[in-house]
């Protein structure tokens, strides 16, 4: 851990706990800061706050009292999910208090160089792919950030021989100041989290913060297929490398079903361990990072051919009576479902879809679902998805939940078929999050498998 005197004897307010807030509180305390933690959850139900109090850190729980900011805080470190319209955040900003996120702290103390990955879709899969390839190629890559391992916690023990492979959300990137990765990757940009950012332009700007401090000695990797790329490319000091599944570019690309980097053949696309056009794109982005990091073509190809996916992201669960099950519960929008379907022959696919009704029409999904063997529909959006199925000429059945849908799908399946959970909708009408939805699918698969044995 690098020496950092920035916060020594400075009052710092941590707004919101969760994993990142807890990690930030411990790090700042270690750096000599006078830390106060404020979390909305009651103290009695808040084991993280209880633990921090035992360590001598001041905690204020159960509400967010504005008068707390009457103290002379030098910095606020907020949970990324707390919006900037929050009264505490607004008051801090009005008083001129810098509002940071925990990844900024990670950068300030990290001895390890940082590879930073952001984007609308594919962040977690690509971050995991990159770490796996780097590790197989002889590097020491440490997963961190929005992937479940607080960046500041990982950075505390990372050495200069490690590489922090960091997944970053737009929320986290709004709270950086000096953050400076050596390699940064933007997988793609789609209009998401608009309720938080207010507009697509504001969302893009948040993502673009990733390159704010990069220089010509650093490399920014961009998706050449994105409409915004040409304009954004003119606004960075970083050196540029591109990836594309559709055209030859200065970087990583697909040509005639083969993956290349600057003219060097890496592997066949069909040898990738995970299906779908989106995973070709994820692999190309990974290849760009790997080649820039000095990894051999052999190590890249070996890792990507054996990569089995990430939980809830087109994760292959296995087969029952030669029927394959894929869990893509992270598919919370139409684009994610389209990309999942691109990896399969539709006439063998039984698609489980539906969820929170956000007012979407599913017209854009119609070309992608044509020829499906069957659709099993559930949730608030089922009625609208029925209309899309009818227009695509696809038969459908209804289910009351994912477990019911899994059973119905298996009853419809024949050997060689694929049962794909790729909802194209958020989960919140029926489940707390996509993970719980996906876990129900996994449990249903395991129960069916047990029943067949």
Swiss-Prot record:
An MF annotation (GO) of this entry: UDP-N-acetylmuramoylalanine-D-glutamate ligase activity
Keyword Repeat: no
Enzyme class: ligase
Positions that bind ATP: 119-125
Cellular compartments annotated: Cytoplasm
Keywords from the UniProt entry: ATP-binding, Cell cycle, Cell division, Cell shape, Cell wall biogenesis/degradation, Cytoplasm, Ligase, Nucleotide-binding, Peptidoglycan synthesis
GO cellular component: cytoplasm
Origin superkingdom: Bacteria
Pathway(s) of this molecule: Cell wall biogenesis; peptidoglycan biosynthesis
One GO-annotated biological process of the protein: cell division
Enzyme Commission number(s): 6.3.2.9
Catalysed reaction, written as an equation: UDP-N-acetyl-alpha-D-muramoyl-L-alanine + D-glutamate + ATP = UDP-N-acetyl-alpha-D-muramoyl-L-alanyl-D-glutamate + ADP + phosphate + H(+)
Keyword rRNA-binding: no
InterPro entries found in the cross-reference section: Mur-like_cat_sf, Mur_ligase_C, Mur_ligase_C_dom_sf, Mur_ligase_cen, MurD
Chief location of this protein within or outside the cell: cytoplasm
HAMAP family tied to this protein: MurD (MF_00639)
Task performed by this protein: Cell wall formation. Catalyzes the addition of glutamate to the nucleotide precursor UDP-N-acetylmuramoyl-L-alanine (UMA).
Family recorded in the similarity comment: Belongs to the MurCDEF family.
Name of the protein: UDP-N-acetylmuramoylalanine--D-glutamate ligase
């Amino acid at each position: 851990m690098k020496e950092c005197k920035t916060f020594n004897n400075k009052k710092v307010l941590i707004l919101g706990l969760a994993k990142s807030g807890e990690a930030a509180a411990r790090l700042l305390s270690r750096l000599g800061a006078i830390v106060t933690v404020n979390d909305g959850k009651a103290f009695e139900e808040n084991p993280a706050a209880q633990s921090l109090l035992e360590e001598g850190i001041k905690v204020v729980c159960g509400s967010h009292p504005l008068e707390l900011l009457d103290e002379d805080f030098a910095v606020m470190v907020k949970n990324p999910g707390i919006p900037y319209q929050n009264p505490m955040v607004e008051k801090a900003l009005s008083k001129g208090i810098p509002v940071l996120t925990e990844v900024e702290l990670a950068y300030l103390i990290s001895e390890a160089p940082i590879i930073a990955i952001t984007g609308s879709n594919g962040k977690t899969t690509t971050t995991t792919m990159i770490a796996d390839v780097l590790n197989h190629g002889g590097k020491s890559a440490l997963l961190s950030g929005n992937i479940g391992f607080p960046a500041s916690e990982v950075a505390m023990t990372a050495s200069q021989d490690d590489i922090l492979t960091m997944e970053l959300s737009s929320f986290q990137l709004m709270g950086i100041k000096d953050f400076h990765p050596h390699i940064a990757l933007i997988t793609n940009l789609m209009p998401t989290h608009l309720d938080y950012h207010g507009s697509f332009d504001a969302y893009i700007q948040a993502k673009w913060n990733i390159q704010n401090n990069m220089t010509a000695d650093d490399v920014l990797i961009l998706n050449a297929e994105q409409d915004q790329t040409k304009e954004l490319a003119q606004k960075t000091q970083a050196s540029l490398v591109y990836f594309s599944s559709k055209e030859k570019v200065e970087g990583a690309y697909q040509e005639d079903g083969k993956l290349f980097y600057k003219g060097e053949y890496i592997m066949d696309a069909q040898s990738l361990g995970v299906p779908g056009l989106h995973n070709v794109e994820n692999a190309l982005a990974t290849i760009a990072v790997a080649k820039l990091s000095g990894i051999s073509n052999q190590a890249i190809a070996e890792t990507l051919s054996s990569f089995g996916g990430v939980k809830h992201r087109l994760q292959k669960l296995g087969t029952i009576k030669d029927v394959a099950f894929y869990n893509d519960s992270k598919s919370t929008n139409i684009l994610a479902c389209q990309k999942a379907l691109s990896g399969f022959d539709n006439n063998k696919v039984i698609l489980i879809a539906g969820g929170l009704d956000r007012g979407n029409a599913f017209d854009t999904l119609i070309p992608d679902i044509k020829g499906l063997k069957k659709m099993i529909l559930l949730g608030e959006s089922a009625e609208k998805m029925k209309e899309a199925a009818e227009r695509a000429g696809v038969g459908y059945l209804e289910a009351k939940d994912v477990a019911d849908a899994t059973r119905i799908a298996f009853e419809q399946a024949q050997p060689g078929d694929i049962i794909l959970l790729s909802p194209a909708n958020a989960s919140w009408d029926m489940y707390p999050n996509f993970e719980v939805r996906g876990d129900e699918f996994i449990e249903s698969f395991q129960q069916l498998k047990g029943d067949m044995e």
